[in-house]
Structure formats: structure tokens, C-alpha cells
Swiss-Prot record:
This is Probable tRNA-dihydrouridine synthase. Pfam families: Dus. It is an enzyme of class 1 (oxidoreductase). The active site is at C102. It comes from Azospirillum brasilense. NCBIfam families: nifR3_yhdG. SUPFAM superfamilies: FMN-linked oxidoreductases. Catalyzes the synthesis of 5,6-dihydrouridine (D), a modified base found in the D-loop of most tRNAs, via the reduction of the C5-C6 double bond in target uridines. Keywords: Flavoprotein, FMN, NADP, Oxidoreductase, RNA-binding, tRNA processing, tRNA-binding. GO terms for molecular function: flavin adenine dinucleotide binding; tRNA binding; tRNA dihydrouridine synthase activity. FMN binds at P18, M19, S20, Q72, K141, N202, G203, D204, G226, R227. Disulfide bonds: none annotated.
């Protein structure tokens, strides 16, 4: 089971979802090292991109080791989206992904994200302008629709294909749902049936059973994993292996999870600097440690610390007895 996105062949049908504040360079690097068909940047505003805002440029930094990497753009002006796409192509992006799915109020009020599912004419102009501006493939991520009375993802997928889009990902919720309720994977079958380009299913893919059901119900060509990778950068690789072989690999042993956490922690400090790195690291440390004994107290203590060496030592001290218990 493989996915072809224009001229690019993915190693496997698993994509790391774009997630604001999560899929930065250190996290993408870890996921790609473990194994993942495609990693996607955090969503970036096209206006900030063409101004070459320093923070925005850091968010879309590409490494050869992460190939293929997609940069996700949000915006409502076709010419600006096109210019931002070209800038990212020049900076090494392998794929441009267009965001028609973000439900956040600030984005929607700016007539971007899922707001564009309510304006198919403007959506088409954005899709066409972006696809024509670059030589690399352009993809689209969207939701079922704005609400249950406007489930227009199949129609918008057809428009996207006509505009030159090479792959569509659908999150199985409406904008009105945000992340509430459960993802409707079966609806995505209607999108798959509407187009000839690959379709990827997204939403609530957090386990092997979910992978089975999502693919069976949607008929999709692949899966996009978002929150299922929180604290588990190895999960996309497990899913890749499972789809390829049918074998459900266990999570890495706890001492390897600790090594991964510390590698990630050091990478965040290097990428953001001490203060910024600690701020970003706290949520990841929380996700990694979820489910371990006394993890709530551990997270609370980490959140009060400001010395990076003290945090590193505290992480080791917290994991040590758990690793000993696992080895006993």
C-alpha cells in the first residue's frame, strides 16, 4: 500500500499531521527518524511567510533528512498563497499543503482555514493559483464541511482535483464540531469515490484498531496521524509497519522511551534556546510521561523548573524506578 503524490512516492501510507505548536523541526525529525511516509510542518500564515517573518521561517525549516516534507499554508488571498508556496519551494519544501480545515476562531475570522469551505469560488481560486505557482505537488487538508447542513467535502475535492491538487486529506469532523464527538470515517468514502487522486483519512487515529476501522470505513489510501503521536513519535512508524506486514509492534521499552524523550528535549533547547525550549518541552514531557506512576506530580514539578540541567536530571530520576520495575 503506497501513495503517489504527483511526482513523489511515499515510503508508506502514513502522514504526520500538521499541528500548531507540535510538529516543529525537532518533533518532525524524531518522527521521520522512526519512520513515516510524510511529515508536515505546523500551519503557517501565508502573509507572515511572504514577509519572511523570522519565527515563521523557523517553523518551515527543511532538512534533507526529513524528505519528503510538506509545508502547510493558510490564507485567503490567492496571490499571497501562491507567492508563499513559491518561497517554500525555493527553500526546499517537497510538497505544499493548503489548509481548509483549521477550526480555530482566529483563523476562521480571517477567512482562512475551514472558513474557505463556505466559499467554494474563493477556495477554487486559491487552489488553482497555488498549484500553478510551483512545480512541486500541492495537496489539500479539509473537514467534512462547515456543519452538518453543508457537507461539501466531496464537491470541494472534485474542484481541488480540477485545479491540479494531487492529494486530499479529510478530517472526519465538521468545523462546528471542532474536536468534539468522534471522527466520521465512513463519510470520507464519499470523497474517495468523488476523485481519482489519493484520499487520506484523518481524525482519532490513535491505535492499531483505529487504523483498521478508519481504512475499512473510508476506503482511503492512507492515514494521517495527529494527536495519536503526542508523546509517541514512534507511533507513525508502528502504523507503517502494521499496514505493511500486519504485525502490531509493541511500544519501545521504557529505557528507549527515556532516550527518545531526552533526545527530543535537547533538540528543543537547541532549536529554541533555553527559555523557549523549556516552554515548548513541558507539554511534550507531559505527553511522554502520561500513564506512568506519579506522573501528575512529576509534570507539576517540571512546570515549576527553569534550570534545564535540573529538568534533565529530574526526568532521569523520575523514569529510573519505572524502568527498574519493568526490568524486574
Amino acid at each position: 500500500m503506497a501513495i503517489q503524490i504527483g511526482t513523489i512516492s511515499l515510503e508508506g501510507p502514513v502522514i504526520l499531521a500538521p499541528m500548531s505548536g507540535v510538529t516543529d523541526l525537532p518533533f518532525r525529525r524524531l518522527v521521520k527518524q522512526s519512520g513515516c511516509g510524510l511529515v508536515v510542518s505546523e500551519m503557517v500564515a501565508s502573509q507572515a511567510m511572504i514577509r519572511e517573518n523570522r519565527q515563521t521561517l523557523r517553523m518551515v525549516e527543511c532538512e534533507p533528512e526529513q524528505f519528503p516534507m510538506a509545508v502547510q499554508l493558510a490564507g485567503c488571498e490567492p496571490d499571497v498563497m501562491a507567492e508563499a508556496a513559491k518561497l517554500n519551494e525555493d527553500r526546499g519544501a517537497a510538497i505544499i499543503d493548503i489548509n481548509f480545515g483549521c477550526p480555530v476562531k482566529k483563523v476562521v475570522n480571517g477567512h482562512a482555514g475551514s472558513s474557505l469551505m463556505r466559499d467554494e469560488a474563493l477556495a477554487a481560486r486559491i487552489l488553482e493559483a497555488t498549484a500553478k505557482a510551483v512545480t512541486i505537488p500541492v495537496t489539500l487538508k479539509m473537514r467534512k464541511g462547515w456543519d452538518d447542513s453543508s457537507l461539501n467535502a466531496p464537491r470541494l475535492a472534485r474542484i481541488a482535483e480540477e485545479c491540479g491538487i494531487k492529494l486530499v486529506t479529510v478530517h472526519g469532523r465538521t468545523r462546528e464540531q471542532f474536536y468534539n464527538g468522534t471522527a466520521d470515517w465512513s463519510f470520507i468514502r464519499s470523497v474517495k469515490e468523488a476523485v481519482s487522486i489519493p484520499v487520506v483519512v484523518n481524525g482519532d487515529i490513535t491505535s492499531f484498531d483505529a487504523v483498521d476501522r478508519a481504512l475499512a470505513e473510508s476506503g482511503a489510501d492512507g492515514v494521517m496521524i495527529g494527536r495519536g503521536a503526542y508523546g509517541r513519535p514512534w507511533f507513525p512508524a508502528q502504523v507503517m509497519h502494521y499496514i505493511r506486514t500486519g504485525e502490531r509492534l509493541p511500544d519501545p521499552p521504557l529505557h528507549e522511551q527515556l532516550d527518545t524523550l531526552l533526545e527530543h528535549y535537547d533538540a528543543m533547547l537547541t532549536h529554541y534556546g533555553v527559555e523557549g525550549g523549556l516552554r515548548v518541552a513541558r507539554k511534550h514531557i507531559s505527553w511522554y510521561s502520561t500513564g506512568l506512576r506519579d506522573s501528575a506530580e512529576f509534570r507539576s514539578e517540571v512546570n515549576r523548573m527553569s534550570d534545564p540541567e535540573r529538568v534533565r536530571g529530574f526526568i532521569r530520576d523520575f523514569y529510573a524506578p519505572a524502568i527498574e520495575r519493568m526490568a524486574a
